[in-house]
């Protein structure tokens, strides 16, 4: 791979549902629910994307989701969805805008092909360690489908030029616009198909020294590793083949909200609240913050809620 120092992206021919089927096809991400929940959500809906991203639901309850047959089923279903016209590939390479509305707040993301060498060279910044077993699971999924079924989420530095392009498209009628029944989140989608706009977006990203993974460390690692693997297997590798790119939705930093990632501890293991706080105090500086909700103020700062009180 050639060394990259700025972000490289490209438009791509998206594979997506027709307008009238999008609500039936759309699903939550693969990693926010278990097999039983996916089975329940997809019940009676043969068009649900869960048949591709959680294909174990098409097998008897208790089937190991890492069984080779399950991965093969994902590929079989992906082909079937295309054969039946539930997923259709666009004729030309586009960028797309995907907006999510949560609790009254909307964030607008650019859907792009991110560049594998950018991941390898650190232009795409990571902030989580990944587990090899989870990488391997997603790698098998990418390999067997020869596609990125789900995008990763990136943050990019605020950019007025991109804001203006996005504002122009989002003022128009969207291709998709629906509210998901399970969580009430709004999903809206536009296609950026004008060549001049596509070139402007590519050029603006080429000025960015870094993109940041907001969500999807394992999917990013898997896509990049499979891309590198395919490059190694191709004696005529040029660097512009499709496998050098993976699907990412990029949100400007000013629109991203960092949501709590909380953990519930069910009991104090026989300790009183005072003893528990004293034990925590051996490794942390503990400070009482009162009854109002307290959120971490910086790196290595945690908040703790115990017996009606907040602690830093």
Q: Which residues does each predicted region cover?
A:
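Surface-exposed, charge/polar-rich loops and edge strands
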Residues: 5-312
């Amino acid at each position: 791979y050639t060394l990259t120092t700025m972000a490289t992206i490209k438009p791509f021919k998206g594979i997506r549902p027709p307008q009238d089927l999008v609500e039936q096809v759309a699903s939550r991400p693969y990693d926010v629910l278990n097999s039983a929940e996916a089975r329940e959500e997809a019940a009676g809906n043969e068009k649900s994307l869960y048949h591709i991203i959680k294909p174990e639901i098409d097998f008897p309850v208790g089937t190991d989701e890492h069984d080779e047959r399950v991965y093969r089923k994902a590929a079989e279903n992906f082909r079937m969805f295309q054969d039946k016209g539930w997923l259709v590939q666009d004729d030309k390479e586009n960028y797309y805008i995907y907006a999510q509305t949560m609790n009254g707040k909307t964030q607008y993301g650019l859907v792009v092909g991110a560049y594998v060498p950018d991941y390898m060279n650190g232009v795409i910044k990571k902030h989580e360690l990944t587990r090899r077993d989870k990488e391997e699971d997603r790698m098998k999924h990418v390999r067997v489908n020869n596609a990125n079924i789900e995008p990763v989420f990136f943050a990019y530095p605020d950019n007025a030029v991109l804001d203006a392009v996005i504002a122009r498209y989002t003022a128009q009628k969207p291709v998709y616009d629906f509210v998901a029944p399970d969580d009430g989140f709004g999903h809206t989608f536009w296609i950026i198909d004008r060549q001049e706009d596509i070139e402007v977006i590519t050029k603006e990203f080429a000025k960015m020294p870094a993109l940041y993974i907001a969500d999807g460390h394992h999917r990013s690692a898997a896509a990049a590793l499979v891309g590198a693997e395919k490059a190694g297997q191709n004696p005529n590798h040029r660097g512009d083949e499709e496998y050098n790119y993976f699907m990412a939705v990029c949100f400007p930093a000013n629109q991203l909200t960092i949501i709590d990632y909380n953990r519930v501890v069910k009991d104090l293991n026989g300790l009183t609240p005072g003893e528990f706080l004293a034990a925590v105090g051996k490794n942390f500086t503990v400070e009482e913050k009162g009854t109002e909700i307290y959120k971490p103020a910086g790196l290595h700062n945690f908040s703790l809620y115990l017996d009606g009180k907040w602690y830093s």
